[in-house]
């Protein structure tokens, strides 16, 4: 019986993970769950799965959750805050940690799981974008097992040699696929007027609002490029992005002999989640098997960087190295939140990120404190840009 902790249990990844657990009660039990503010969803999960511990973001949310669980007769221990979140990530009572908190907020707890030598199922790409060197060092030094859950990186992991899932061993290129989001064919001159609801209407995947906007700008793919660099040791020039509107081929690996290995499947995050949970075995994920006779043609195209400037900015940050990826991520988080709140235009997201990247960066990528200093400085810089863009 594998005991699992889910960080970000009420998000789309967390709920999909619980669905896989639900299908295999003989293999998995839930040790701990966390959510930031969705108390009702977390309470329902605690009633069903009876975790030993649950963590929320605030004292008020903790009181509300405790009351609900007490009324339901559920003895789950409730706590709140960043320290409590790190505590459940490194808890001796858990074997595997699903790191599914979105954004920089998930960095410390994901890193805590790695430093505790856990089996880390990494859906929080920002952990590697912000502090890739620190994170990978922690995995090696503490004997953690790192399994990528993003569908693209999970696909690459499956296509690389199992004896050494890193760049090398005859690998010539890593090919990340992208759906292109909802604006793949839209005239770039009209993107100025995109609304948050339009940006969040992804044609293939069901995701939260922040990652949906990142998909629409292709910043999500840019962050995944940086993540792939750290996960697989591939240099920027050996990572290629291809738009694949059908979202059937989740990524590919090209080899020196001319072979290209691809992982295919219906677009459902339960597939990579189940793969990570059961690795090296495979289990039923609940996903409908792919029928290639129904899927039809598979099409690929090169991204248009005029339409998707955020993708180019991510490659720039990767090549710059140091804290540039952390700066990129922080500025993007601020800009996307502002867009979702109606404070700036869709096209302003890339403008904010580009402007902040051009500024001298504070902090060092050698320590977590340095990375967090760069993150804070970049957020201040991005906030400073918002005023000049508001109302445009």
From Swiss-Prot:
Name of the protein in its database record: 1-deoxy-D-xylulose 5-phosphate reductoisomerase
Binding site for Mn(2+): 150, 152, 224
Annotated 1-deoxy-D-xylulose 5-phosphate binding sites: 125, 151-152, 179, 202, 215, 220-221, 224
InterPro entries with a match to the protein in the record: DXP_reductoisomerase, DXP_reductoisomerase_C, DXP_reductoisomerase_N, DXPR_C, DXPR_C_sf, NAD(P)-bd_dom_sf
Catalytic activity: 2-C-methyl-D-erythritol 4-phosphate + NADP(+) = 1-deoxy-D-xylulose 5-phosphate + NADPH + H(+)
Function noted in UniProt: Catalyzes the NADPH-dependent rearrangement and reduction of 1-deoxy-D-xylulose-5-phosphate (DXP) to 2-C-methyl-D-erythritol 4-phosphate (MEP).
Residues that bind NADPH: 10-13, 37-38, 124, 126, 208
Metabolic or biological pathway, per its Swiss-Prot or TrEMBL entry: Isoprenoid biosynthesis; isopentenyl diphosphate biosynthesis via DXP pathway; isopentenyl diphosphate from 1-deoxy-D-xylulose 5-phosphate: step 1/6
EC number(s) given by UniProt: 1.1.1.267
Gene3D superfamilies xref list: 1.10.1740.10, NAD(P)-binding Rossmann-like Domain
Recorded family membership: Belongs to the DXR family.
Domain of life: Bacteria
Gene Ontology biological-process annotations: isopentenyl diphosphate biosynthetic process, methylerythritol 4-phosphate pathway involved in terpenoid biosynthetic process
Molecular-function annotations in GO: 1-deoxy-D-xylulose-5-phosphate reductoisomerase activity; manganese ion binding; NADPH binding
Cofactor(s) needed for function: Mg(2+); Mn(2+)
Taxonomic source organism: Cupriavidus metallidurans (strain ATCC 43123 / DSM 2839 / NBRC 102507 / CH34)
Keywords assigned: Isoprene biosynthesis, Manganese, Metal-binding, NADP, Oxidoreductase
Keyword Acetylation: no
Main EC class the enzyme belongs to: oxidoreductase
Alphabetized PANTHER family for the sequence: 1-DEOXY-D-XYLULOSE 5-PHOSPHATE REDUCTOISOMERASE, 1-DEOXY-D-XYLULOSE 5-PHOSPHATE REDUCTOISOMERASE, CHLOROPLASTIC
SUPFAM superfamilies documented for this protein: 1-deoxy-D-xylulose-5-phosphate reductoisomerase, C-terminal domain (SSF69055), Glyceraldehyde-3-phosphate dehydrogenase-like, C-terminal domain (SSF55347), NAD(P)-binding Rossmann-fold domains (SSF51735)
